[in-house]
Amino acid sequence: GPCSLESQENCKEVLDALYPIMKGKDWYFKGSFDKANRTSIHSDRGPGIHKGLDIFAWIKATYPSVKLVTDIHEPWQAEKLSGYIDMIQIPAFLCRQTDLVIACAKWFKHINVKKGQWLSPQAMEHVVTKIKEVNPKAKVYITERGTSFGYSGLMPDFRAVDIMKSFSDGVFLDCTHSTQKPKGETTGGDRELAKKYALAAKIFEYDGVFIETHPDPTNAISDADSQVELEWIVSQINNI
């Protein structure tokens, strides 16, 4: 799905394209209600939690069987989101925040943790342990979203897949955020490289992929350089 929910109309355009072709596949529609870590204080952060919940409710009512995933930023949000979201996602920058991790473990059965860009794959076992100690029945997944490569680059470490599989319930590759180039007033990216990561993920035996897609990426309110065109996803879904 899109980086930000942006609007109900934008979500409808994405879902109208994906819903028919994703039947029979294990997939989640992703959209963020709040882009809480924007580079600039003036950047659009999205609809916010209250309007976001309305959009999530509309999706559930309009597209039966669609599962939802969104990111959380503060512990109090867990309870509010639990009635709408099938899998909660902990952002990479927040993956060591114990109160947030515990809140997710208390309210969700499926938790996707983005690996911090500065952390070794082995260090993620501590995050998984926190969740499992609070909720032993929770399914905990780890998403590789790139490791810091110099001051303004990220590079996925394909060696980490088997390491993180050994203590989690699955490992995903974030194809789009792994191409980000944190710099200046905006965060850059490389959607063409993201497409190559998506096609290569199965070679490294990831359990799944995380891909942000948008009908008009260059005009998206966030991650305009890394989101993949919706038509590309439609054309390549059976190759991913």
Question: Across the structure, where does each feature detected by a protein language model lie?
Answer:
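Glycine-rich phosphate-binding active-site loops on the catalytic face of alpha/beta enzymes
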Residues: S4, A92-L94, Y197, A201-D223
